[in-house]
Amino acid sequence: MVLTDIEYLLSYLEAHHVPTIKKKRHTYLTYHGLAEHYTYVLKDGIIKNSIILQDGREYNLSYIAKPDVISLLRDEVSRSTDQPFNVRIESEYATFYQVNRVAFWKYVNSTPELQNYVKNYYRKKLSENILRLQRMVMNGKKGAICAFIYSLVDLFGRKVNEGILIDFVVTNDDIAGFCGISSRSSVNRMLKELRTDGVITVKNHKFIIQDVSYLLDQIAN
């Protein structure tokens, strides 16, 4: 059986007995700007990446809900590097491989399969960042919220009788943080409009998307 890039990385770390750490919900793995000696690889769980803006507001970047390297930014040789963003645990627990960052790059430079993973990682992150920027610039508040809700389908969506259940609790504050909206009341108002229009409903604090095409119609591409 041919392994995917991330499956190969996980099996490689297991074979080299790389230690793991476990963190509880709403604790932080790293903070933006903190000097860090390790590279972390999410083994299981859900995390959220964010940065703090100059005005003190938190701007959310992404959820990560499947195994992946948390950050490969910066150079390969320094024993420590400043972390590019905050990493907060959003599931009950999350488990990470904790790899000395210099050792990690030695693994990569000596293993073609890991080199391929790193190349694909950077391509994927660049593509995600460009798409996120496009949606922020080209959409108003409602379009940004519709784009964000639609993005949750791939991460947490599953089919139910009523539509597509987003099987993860996302708060209005989180939505505001992902969409660059400073007023929580704006999020509340637009979510109410979407419920009134039959686009979404809420059950047990989770969204059910009833009209995906409406969301897509609101997103500028």
Curated annotation (Swiss-Prot):
Annotated disulfide bonds: none
Top-level taxon: Bacteria
Record's note on what induces expression: Induced by L-lactate but not by a racemic mixture of DL-lactate. Makes part of the larR(MN)QO operon.
The entry's DNA-binding region: 172-192
Residue ranges annotated for the HTH crp-type domain, each copy included: 139-213
One of the record's GO molecular function terms: DNA binding
SMART domains reported in the protein's UniProt record: HTH_CRP
Keywords tagged on the record: Activator, DNA-binding, Transcription, Transcription regulation
Keyword Transcription regulation: yes
PROSITE patterns (alphabetical): HTH_CRP_1, HTH_CRP_2
Keyword flag Transcription regulation: yes
Regulation: L-lactate acts as a positive effector on the binding and multimerization of LarR on DNA, while D-lactate antagonizes the positive effect of L-lactate.
Main function: Positive transcriptional regulator that is absolutely required for the expression of lactate racemase (Lar) activity. Controls Lar expression by sensing the L-/D-lactate ration. Binds to a 16-bp palindromic sequence (Lar box motif) that is present in the larR-larA intergenic region, allowing transcription of the larABCDE operon.
SUBUNIT field: Multimerizes on DNA. Multimerization is required for transcription activation.
Protein's UniProt name: Lactate racemization regulatory protein
Organism: Lactiplantibacillus plantarum (strain ATCC BAA-793 / NCIMB 8826 / WCFS1) (Lactobacillus plantarum)
Gene name linked to the record: larR
